[in-house]
């Protein structure tokens, strides 16, 4: 049977499972491009400091050309110290950029599944398939085009300074070095910016490719639903959501109530009664604690009478359901309250 077409976007559950396996949309181009670009900017910013350290390294090496073998230890210490001073800022910058670029792409994730042993990784046939896959072909073509593009841009930027460098022997050494550093900086930063733009395009493509890869068929959606239907966590989440919706609907009915009976703050029952339509008062809302307080608050906002009847409230609460009529045994007590409420309304409007 032919594989069913995957036309549906991945569900949150599928995305979470795929993420746990270490499969996320990412582009290594972004990290490498940012490292190169920011390292260049750091070199420009700390150029004087780095140049001084490089000169010290050079002097340290040349100063010990004719040194005695007993002085080589001191040479090593000086050389190592200066190298560390030069490379430490670049190392920490590169580390920070790599971490932040990956966090920006797919957030924090820790999983050992990509490191787990899989037979297909050592299967030579699978290796050959990966080598001749469309993904490998795309990466090869992309990197080749990227290399040609960057070379073309470098040639274009350097072309303007070509004449100066060819005739540099006629200029002072300081001016030649200054021009060389300036031209190199402009060229490298331009290449870094272009490489970063290419990296963002690569990430957009990888994101599209990832979304396409994790798409689901209708059959997979049905199977996932059946699988999750009995999952305790999902069931509790669904029940909580249903309770929240029921509570919202119930609170929306409170403004339609005729009276609210309370105990006085622990229990609240909102009753609606229309003599022309209802055979008996209907419970539109009920609740304890904070829900009871909310019912009373809404009732007061809509000028609905709130009557304190602790014994009746305690008796009504377990015996009635929202949306149902009260039982006959409460008719007399509730009728007296509603009659009193209606009498007060008539007296107000009289």
Swiss-Prot record:
It is a multi-pass membrane protein. The chain crosses the membrane at residues 30-50, 90-110, 147-167, 185-205. Keywords: Bacterial flagellum biogenesis, Bacterial flagellum protein export, Cell inner membrane, Cell membrane, Membrane, Protein transport, Transmembrane, Transmembrane helix, Transport. GO terms for biological process: bacterial-type flagellum assembly; protein secretion. InterPro entries: FlhB, T3SS_substrate_exporter, T3SS_substrate_exporter_C. GO terms for cellular component: plasma membrane. SUPFAM superfamilies: EscU C-terminal domain-like. The keyword Membrane applies. NCBIfam families: flhB. Required for formation of the rod structure in the basal body of the flagellar apparatus. Together with FliI and FliH, may constitute the export apparatus of flagellin. This is Flagellar biosynthetic protein FlhB. It comes from Aquifex aeolicus (strain VF5). The gene is flhB.
